[in-house]
Every structure is written in structure tokens, then in C-alpha cells.
Amino acid sequence: MTAHIITGGGTGIGAATARLLADAGDDVVIVGRRAEPLLAVAATHERIHAITADAADGVAMADVVASTTERFGGVAGLVANAGGHGYSTVGSTTDDEWRSSLEANLTTAFVAIRAALDELERSRGAIVVVSSIAGLAAGPETAGYTVGKHALIGLVRSVARDYGRRGVRINALCPGWVRTPMSDEEMSVLVQRGDAPDVESAYALVTRDVPLGRAADAGEIAATIAFLLGPASTYVHGATIVADGGSTIVDVPTLAYG
């Protein structure tokens, strides 16, 4: 018996993934810095177990892996989903903001992967690193976030190159807009600026040029993560999987033509 570990498991994509995996019969350990949302998610399913820890803390993540292994016999998969903000231009980003953004968006994944690698080798397990389409292109005034998400793809490729022959699979997942509490906050910025009258209108605004015409539900992204962790994707390795409703296929200079 083994379990999956999900960082950033208290809300959004992490919480949706935990529920989906638990419903499928897997044990899941969710990790985050805030106990309250973790416990709320864990209360929804007997197979979801919460550990309060900072995914960027090497000692803390080593303890999470050790506790998971002791309780469940090993680690079957890791979802490196923790992330954070980094919303400013290079010129207006302070040193502290830069460090904080890279810690939240990149270091958390690096530390979690490093902590889990030995157990994942033993189980021949899989890793999914949740990046973003911000890992493929740059939005305005998002220097720290954009750089961190781009770097995650490099991290995935490095681990894939070094650990594939040791039995560990790893892939990057790049979602577009997903309805999560963090995205709701970003929609609220558009409402406050007067660009949209409410959050629903803001989502419509930011997805007006998305070929599917909408944001994803967190459960849709969770299903993609479950696929990448599972037996249906055993030859998918070192890949960057995009789940963005078609956003990144759009030829921006042709938008005026409809």
C-alpha cells in the first residue's frame, strides 16, 4: 500500500485532485502551510490525510515523506502543485518579492521532488509538476510568476533525464484559466478596476479569445493529473502537457479578424 502526496492540497487544483484520487481508492496526503483549508479537505474523505508543512522547507518535506512512508508503506506519486504570486514588473520587483515568488513557484517543487525521489524510485512512481501557460508565455506585470513557471519546465526535464532509467516518471502540466480561489482573486482585480461588473463577467472577459470559450473547472485539471499519475500514461515522460482550452494555439496577431 502506498499513497500520493500533493503540495498545495488545501484549495483549488490540489484539493480537487485529492478528492478525485481518493474517490478512485487511493490514499492521499495533502500538504500546505495553512491547517484550516487542509483539514476541511481531509474532512471530505476518509482517504485524504492532512499534514501542515511548508513545501519549500527541506526538513519539513523530508518529514512528510517519512511520515507517509511509515503510515502507507511508500509514495506512489507526487503532485507538486504549491505556488504563489509574483505580480509585478522586473523594475518594480523588490529583492524580497523576487525571492518569495521563486520560493513559492519553483523551490516548493524542487524541494518536494528531492524529498520524495528515493521513495518514488522504490515504487517506480510518477510526478506531476503543475506549471501554467505562464510557463510558456508571458503575461503583463508577472515577472516572478512567469520566470518561476518557466523554470518548472526546466526542472521537469532535468529530473526526467536523470531519473527515468531509475523508474521515476515526471511530467509538467500547464493549465490555463481555472476556476480556483486564486483565480477568483484575479477576477476581483478586474472588477475593482471597472473592467467587469462581477466575477462571472470577468471570467468571460479573460476567456473571450479562448477557443473553448470558458475557464476550466478544477476537476478537469485534476482528471489530467490523475491520467499523468496513472497506468494509462506509462510512456509519457518529460512532457509538457497543456490544458488551456486552446489558449496557446491562438495566433494573437489575427484576433482582429475574429
Predicted regions located by residue number:
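C-terminal substrate-recognition "lid" of short-chain dehydrogenase/reductases
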Residues: 110, 214-243, 248-249
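Residue(s) in the substrate-gating loop at a strand-loop-helix junction
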Residues: 132
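Conserved glycine-rich cofactor-binding loop
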Residues: 10-12
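Substrate-binding pocket helix/loop in short-chain dehydrogenase/reductase
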Residues: 89-90, 97-102, 206
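Short, small/polar-rich loop/turn modules that mediate ligand/substrate recognition or access, typified
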Residues: 79, 164, 169, 236-238
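Alpha-helical segment proximal to the catalytic Tyr-Lys
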Residues: 118, 161-165, 234
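Active-site helix of classical SDR
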Residues: 113, 148, 156
